Every structure is written in structure tokens, then in C-alpha cells.
């Protein structure tokens, strides 16, 4: 199965060239703190034009609109995963938008609370989609040598050992 992954288009999704594949995974930041639900409608229409058999989306920390259930219903051309999973073509996929940030959408600054969220991830998950990286796995920041990943998420990786993972990166 050919899986295409992208993220962080911040309302510029129509400017991105998306290769064909079997599955399209979008790992968050559809918007940039937009308050206009029409942005989600446009994103959903954009998703609908692609031939990928399966499409999976998680929100990111800039997707405050998706904290509202009514706005979540605007995403109909993909499986929208918010601390939830879906099985497609025999693959168990889990998606979580949770971040360790102190503000923004889906922010959970308390490590103990995040650990409880990560505990929801089934051990038999094949593909894990997150908006933040686990600690010390491709988590270097571009401007400093600091690691921005989440230690409790890294511990969950050790428990789950998914076949594949996708967390946000530059698109």
C-alpha cells in the first residue's frame, strides 16, 4: 500500500501537489487559528478531489475550529480521528491531535494527563498518526538544538511498536 502523508498547510492546501497513492494521511494544521468554518468546507472539498481509496485526517494545534463537534461534521471525505481509530484494508490506524503545548487546540500541557490519553492507543495499532513527535525521534527544532518531542508519547511507542508512524512535519 502506498501511503501519502502531509501536514501543516495552514489554509494553503490548494497550493500543495499531492501524489497519487492508496491512502492519504493528513497530520494536522489545516488552518491557522481560523474562525471561519468555510475553511473546513474548502479543505473537505479539496480532499474529495483525490483518488486515494482511504483518507485519514487529524487536527493540529492550529485547528481550533475542530474542537467543536458541529465543525467536525464538515469533514466528510476522510476519517477524522481525534483520539480514535479506524481499520482500513486490514490496517489499524489511530490518530491523536493531542499536544504538550500550553495553548492552542488539543493542548494538554500536563504530562500525566497526556499519558492517560496515550494509554487509549490500542497495542495492536499498525499506523499511529500524531501532531507531535515522540521525544528524540525526529523532534529537533529548526532554530535550536532542543528536542521538542513528548517523553510520554515515546513511552507509548515502546508499548505499541506501530509498523508506521506519522507526525507533523514541514509539508
Where are the regions a protein language model picked out?
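Active-site-proximal beta-strand elements of phosphoester/diester hydrolases
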Residues: 1-9, 27, 90-99, 126-131
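Core catalytic region of metal-dependent phosphoesterases/phosphodiesterases
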Residues: 6-88
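Catalytic metal-binding/acid-base residues of hydrolase active sites
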Residues: 10, 31, 61-64, 97-99, ...
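Active-site-proximal loop/helix segments of hydrolase catalytic cores
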Residues: 10, 16-18, 107-125, 129-130, ...
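Alpha-helix C-terminal capping/helix-to-coil transition sites in glycosyltransferase folds
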Residues: 20, 77, 123-124, 161
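Charged helix-capping and loop-helix junction motifs
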Residues: 38-43, 74-78, 109-115, 143-154
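Active-site-proximal segments of metal-dependent phosphoesterases and phosphodiesterases across multiple
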Residues: 39, 102, 124-163
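Helix-adjacent hinge/juxtasegments
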Residues: 71-112
